[in-house]
């Protein structure tokens, strides 16, 4: 058995799985989404290149309306100004500056780092030792970001006492709707991140522009996104290796969890010049979930000859050696990559 990680083709990635039930959908092109108040004059819409799950409409005076297709609408009100008096009840008002954010959608933290906006985050859904983003871990160790409980069990008292201006959740919050309701009762606005529902990897990346609006750093967000686009384009110009890749994790009951071929991760593998071993997996099923569960024997039959196997260690626990991987299943030792 090869001992070197590169020779083994085993990479430990820090990728968070975001899945949940679909919420009600509303059209972002409806005139009602732009004409939201007699006191506001619509100016323009943000031009998005890849993202389809959100929209930003700008109004005179610096007001901006964020529409998350499967979640709701949020009016960002400039500092020193007031929200219109005739807004629809479904529009959540976010008064700038938005501070002491309770960030539960862990995958969003990297966007705040790229915007140099960690100072806007006051609370984390993860503990310091669970963070794979060094800047977040360090901020928590310094006491600048506090742990305020998970999505299903937040520390309401701490969140409210520190003046939390916004809770950014992932779609797991819909498994515990009572938590969302309680936060809203306590006057903490809740925004649900749907970036994981973008079919294009660059669509997920473009959500940095939504967070740029929230923290008042739109130009920085646009620049950060364009840098990611250039990086993707550079990779796309590289020679395609055709190397086969499997991405998976093993649950506590021994079942193997892999991504549907329509998920963004298989698409990223293809964009990087590789080939996902489960080329058409789950395409015939109409479901919002990006995951498919199978028995180890089925996984072995499909992936045993893969050039690379990528273990998603953040879903269970972090692995640091091939030996720890083999403890998950002795059958893995028979894989060519191992």
Predicted regions and their residues:
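Structured C-terminal subdomain patch of bacterial secreted/periplasmic proteins
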Residues: 198-222, 226, 305-338
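Sec-dependent N-terminal signal peptides of Gram-positive bacterial secreted proteins and lipoproteins
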Residues: 5-24
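Flexible, glycine-rich surface segments
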Residues: 237-323
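Extracytoplasmic/secreted envelope proteins and their assembly/folding machinery
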Residues: 88, 95-98, 105-112, 156, ...
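Bacterial Sec-exported substrate-binding components of ABC uptake systems
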Residues: 21-109, 220-247
């Amino acid at each position: 058995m090869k001992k070197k990680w590169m020779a083994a083709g085993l990479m430990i990635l820090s990728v968070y799985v975001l899945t949940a039930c679909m919420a009600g959908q509303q059209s972002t092109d409806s005139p009602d989404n732009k004409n939201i108040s007699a006191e506001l004059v619509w100016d323009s819409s943000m031009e998005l290149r890849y993202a389809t799950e959100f929209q930003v409409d700008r109004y005179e005076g610096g007001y901006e309306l964020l529409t998350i297709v499967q979640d709701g609408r949020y009016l960002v009100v400039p500092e020193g100004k007031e929200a219109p008096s005739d807004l629809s009840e479904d529009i959540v008002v976010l008064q700038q500056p938005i501070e002491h954010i309770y960030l539960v959608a862990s995958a969003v933290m990297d966007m705040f780092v790229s915007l140099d906006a960690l100072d806007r985050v006051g609370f984390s859904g993860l503990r310091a030792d669970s963070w794979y983003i060094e800047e977040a871990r360090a901020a928590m160790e310094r006491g600048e970001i506090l742990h305020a409980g998970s999505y299903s069990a937040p520390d309401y008292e701490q969140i409210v006492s520190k003046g939390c201006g916004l809770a950014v959740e992932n779609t797991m919050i819909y498994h515990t709707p009572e938590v969302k309701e309680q936060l809203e009762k306590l006057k903490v606005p809740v925004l649900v991140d749907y970036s994981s529902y973008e079919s294009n990897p660059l669509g997920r990346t473009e959500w940095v522009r939504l967070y740029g609006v929230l923290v008042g750093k739109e130009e920085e967000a646009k620049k950060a996104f364009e840098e990611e686009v250039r990086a993707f384009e550079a990779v796309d110009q590289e020679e395609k290796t055709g190397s086969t890749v499997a991405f998976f994790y093993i649950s506590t009951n021994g079942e193997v969890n892999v991504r549907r071929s329509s998920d963004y991760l298989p698409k990223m593998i293809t964009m990087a010049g590789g080939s996902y071993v489960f080329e058409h997996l789950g395409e015939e099923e109409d479901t919002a979930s990006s995951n498919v569960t199978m028995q180890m024997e089925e996984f072995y039959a499909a992936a045993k000859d893969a050039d690379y196997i990528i273990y998603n260690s953040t879903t269970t626990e972090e692995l640091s050696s091939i030996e720890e991987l083999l403890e998950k299943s002795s059958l893995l030792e028979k894989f060519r990559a191992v």
